[in-house]
Design a protein with these regions (language model features):
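N-terminal Rossmann-like NAD(P)+-binding subdomain of aldehyde/semialdehyde dehydrogenases
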Residues: 2-155, 432, 535-539, 550-566
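Rossmann-like NAD(P) dinucleotide-binding subdomain of oxidoreductase/dehydrogenase enzymes
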Residues: 145-283, 534-539, 551-563
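ALDH superfamily catalytic-core signature
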Residues: 48-53, 246-385, 447
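Residue-level signal for inorganic ion chemistry
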Residues: 79, 124, 188, 218, ...
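Structural signal for hydrophobic packing residues in well-ordered secondary-structure cores
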Residues: 87-90, 94, 105, 128-135, ...
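Conserved C-terminal structural/oligomerization subdomain of aldehyde/semialdehyde dehydrogenase
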Residues: 4, 12, 17, 43-47, ...
Length: 570
C-alpha cells in the first residue's frame, strides 16, 4: 500500500483493534442450532425471527400447489383481487416495512420509501392497468406465411407456469422480494416466497403483508440455509432467486432437478467508464458517487470500480470527494441518510480488502470504520492495478477503486476480460459510448448516468452469464412467469380428403412426386430472401399471392387423388 501527501493509509479506517476477528461466527452457529426462534444481529441490534419448521415446508408447498390446480388463479378478476389485497397489505404495513429496513441496515426510511416501497406499489398499479391487455392471446396470420394453414386459426396464449418460489435478498429486502412476486401473481401463478434471514425485521414485516391475501395463493417460508435447502427440493414450476452466484448455482441445480424454469438475478463488478470526450465532469462525479454510496455500496448494480481516462483523473477525483460531501456531509457516520453494513461478517470482509489493496487512499472524511456501528466511511482508492485485491470480487461496499486507461479500447478489453457485469455505465460522447456498448456484454447499459435504469418498469432488468439468467419488471415479469402456449384450430372439412393426403404416406416413388412438390409449396414455401428472380420475390412480398400461387396445385391434387379415394372406398 502506498501513501501520498493529503492522503491517508488504512490504519485510521479502523476504530476497533480487533477489527479482523470474525466475531460473527458464533451467531451463525446459533442460527443453525435454534430453528424456532433465532436471534439475528443487524445494524441496530438483534431481532427474533421465527423460522418455519422444516417439517411444515412440504405442506406449505402442497397448499399453494392445490391453490393453483383449483384454477382460481386463471381468473383475471381473482388475480386483480389478490393484487388489490396485496396493495392493501402494503399500505396497512407501510410504516412497519420502512421501520424494519431501517432497523436491519440503517437505510433511511425516506430512501426505502422512494426506491423500494414506491416501486412495488407502482408495479401493482402497472399490472392492474395492463393485465387485461397483456393476457390476451397473440394471433398470427398463418396462411399469409404458409398456405397449408389456410382457414386455420392459431393463437399464443399466456398461461401461468404453475407454482413459483421467489427467494429474496437482504440489501433491498422489499423491492427485490416483492417485485417478482407481483409479476408471478399477476401472471396467474401461486407463490411461496422466502425473505432473507439477514434482514429479519423486514422478513417479519413482509409476512404480515401476506396475511391480507388468500393463503392458497401465496405463503411465506422463513429460515436460513436448512429451511431454504428443503424449500428448493419442492417441485416448483419456476425458481426465482436474487443473490450471489454461489447460491445461484445451487438454485439452478434445484430447478434442473425438476426440469423447471429459473430466473437468477445475481451481480458482478459493474464498471463506470469515464472517457476523455465527456462534456461535464460535475454530474459525472455526482452520479457515480450516488450509485457507489447508496445503501453503503450494498447494491448489485452499484458502480463497483471506475475506469477513467488518464487525462481526466486528476480533475475527477476531487469532484468525487465533493459529491460525497454534498450527499452525506463531511462526517457520514452522523448522517441520517448513510447506511450501515449488514453484519459483522461483511464488515470484516470489507476491511480485509482495504488492508490488502496496494492502491492509494484519497482523503474523503475523517470518520473511521466502526465495527460496533457496522460503519465504513466512503473510501476512494486511487492507483489501483488490474490485479489488485479490490478487483478480485464484487465489493458490495462504499469503496471506489480508480483505474486509469489511455485508450478506449484498453478500457473495453479490461471489461471483457472479466465476467459480464449486471450493469455497465459509460460517460462519454455518443459515438464513444456506442463503441463501448457495441464491443462489450452486460445485463444492462446506461449512458451518462448510473443506477437510474432500475426506476424503469417498461424495460427488462436482468443479467447475462455470471450476472444472471432471465429478466423481469413490468411486462417482462409477466412474460417470465407465463408459458406461451401455442393453440392451433383447424376445420375437419378443409382441406378436402384428396389434398389432405399430401402430408401422409406414402411419400416415395414417382407416382407420389406431386405430393412432395405440392407439400413443399404449401408447408414451406421459399421465403423472399431465398427466391432467385425478382418476379418470384414480388409474389412472396405480397402475402396474399402465396395463397393464390398454390391454388393450381390444389386443383391438380384433387384430380390426381380422385382415383386413389375411389379405390379406398371400394
Amino acid at each position: 500500500m502506498t501513501t501520498q501527501e493529503n492522503k491517508v493509509d488504512s490504519s485510521p479506517l479502523v476504530k476497533n483493534e480487533h477489527a479482523y476477528v470474525d466475531t460473527n461466527s458464533k451467531r451463525h452457529a446459533d442460527v443453525n442450532t435454534n430453528k424456532e426462534h433465532t436471534a439475528v444481529s443487524g445494524a441496530l441490534g438483534s431481532s427474533e425471527l421465527t423460522y418455519t419448521p422444516v417439517s411444515d415446508i412440504s405442506s406449505i408447498f402442497d397448499a399453494v400447489r392445490l391453490g393453483f390446480t383449483s384454477g382460481t388463479q386463471r381468473s383475471l378478476s381473482h388475480r386483480k383481487q389478490q393484487l388489490r389485497q396485496f396493495l392493501r397489505g402494503l399500505r396497512e404495513e407501510k410504516k412497519a416495512l420502512l421501520d424494519a429496513v431501517y432497523f436491519d441496515i440503517r437505510k433511511a426510511r425516506e430512501e426505502t420509501e422512494l426506491f423500494e416501497y414506491n416501486a412495488v406499489e407502482y408495479e401493482i398499479g402497472v399490472f392492474l392497468d395492463n393485465l387485461d391487455a397483456w393476457s390476451q392471446p397473440d394471433h398470427n396470420p398463418l396462411a399469409m406465411q404458409q398456405p397449408a394453414f389456410l382457414l386455420s386459426r392459431g393463437q399464443v396464449r399466456k398461461e401461468p407456469r404453475g407454482t413459483v418460489v421467489v427467494v429474496g435478498a437482504w440489501n433491498y429486502p422489499i423491492r427485490i422480494l416483492l417485485l417478482p412476486v407481483v409479476g408471478a401473481l399477476a401472471a396467474g401463478n401461486t407463490v411461496v416466497m422466502k425473505p432473507s434471514e439477514l434482514s429479519p425485521h423486514t422478513a417479519a414485516a413482509v409476512e404480515r403483508v401476506v396475511r391480507y391475501m388468500d393463503p392458497s395463493v401465496i405463503r411465506v417460508v422463513q429460515g436460513g440455509v436448512e429451511e431454504t435447502t428443503v424449500l428448493l427440493k419442492q417441485s416448483f414450476d419456476h425458481f426465482f432467486y436474487t443473490g450471489n452466484g454461489r447460491v445461484g448455482k445451487v438454485v439452478a441445480r434445484a430447478a434442473a432437478e425438476h426440469l423447471s424454469g429459473v430466473t437468477l438475478e445475481l451481480g458482478g463488478k459493474s464498471p463506470s467508464i469515464v472517457h476523455a470526450d465527456v462534456s461535464d465532469l460535475v454530474p459525472v462525479a455526482t452520479r457515480i458517487m450516488w450509485s457507489k454510496l447508496s445503501n453503503a455500496g450494498q447494491t448489485c448494480v452499484a458502480t463497483d470500480y471506475l475506469l477513467v481516462h488518464r487525462s481526466l483523473k486528476d480533475k475527477l477525483v476531487p469532484l468525487l470527494v465533493d459529491a460525497a460531501h454534498a450527499m452525506f456531509g463531511r462526517s457520514p457516520q452522523k448522517s441520517l441518510d448513510y447506511g450501515r453494513i449488514v453484519n459483522t461478517r461483511s464488515w470484516t470482509r470489507i476491511m480485509k480488502l482495504l488492508t490488502a489493496t496496494e492502491g492509494t487512499f484519497v482523503q474523503v472524511t475523517n470518520d473511521e470504520a466502526d465495527e460496533a456501528d457496522l460503519f465504513i466511511p466512503p473510501v476512494i482508492v486511487d492507483g489501483v492495478r488490474f490485479d489488485d485485491a479490490l478487483m478480485t470480487e464484487e465489493l458490495f461496499a462504499p469503496i471506489l477503486p480508480i483505474i486509469t486507461y489511455d485508450t478506449l479500447d484498453e478500457a473495453i478489453d479490461f471489461v471483457n476480460q472479466n465476467d459480464q457485469p449486471l450493469a455497465l455505465y459509460v460517460f462519454a460522447a455518443s459515438q464513444s459510448a456506442e463503441h463501448v456498448i457495441s464491443h462489450t456484454r452486460s445485463g444492462t447499459a446506461v449512458v451518462n448516468d448510473t443506477f437510474f435504469h432500475l426506476a424503469s418498469h417498461t424495460n427488462p432488468f436482468g443479467g447475462v452469464g455470471p450476472s444472471g439468467v432471465g429478466n423481469y419488471t413490468g411486462k417482462y415479469s409477466f412474460d417470465t412467469f407465463s408459458h406461451q402456449r401455442y393453440v392451433l384450430k383447424r376445420p375437419l372439412w378443409f382441406p378436402s380428403p384428396g389434398v389432405d393426403t399430401v402430408r401422409m404416406p406414402p411419400y416415395s416413388g414417382k407416382e407420389n412426386e406431386w405430393k412432395r412438390e405440392l407439400g413443399n409449396r404449401m408447408v414451406y414455401p421459399a421465403p423472399r430472401a431465398l427466391r432467385d428472380s425478382v418476379w418470384s420475390r414480388l409474389f412472396t412480398f405480397v402475402p396474399f399471392w402465396r395463397v393464390l400461387a398454390i391454388i393450381p396445385g390444389f386443383l391438380a391434387a384433387l384430380i390426381s387423388a380422385k382415383p386413389l379415394i375411389r379405390r379406398r372406398k371400394e
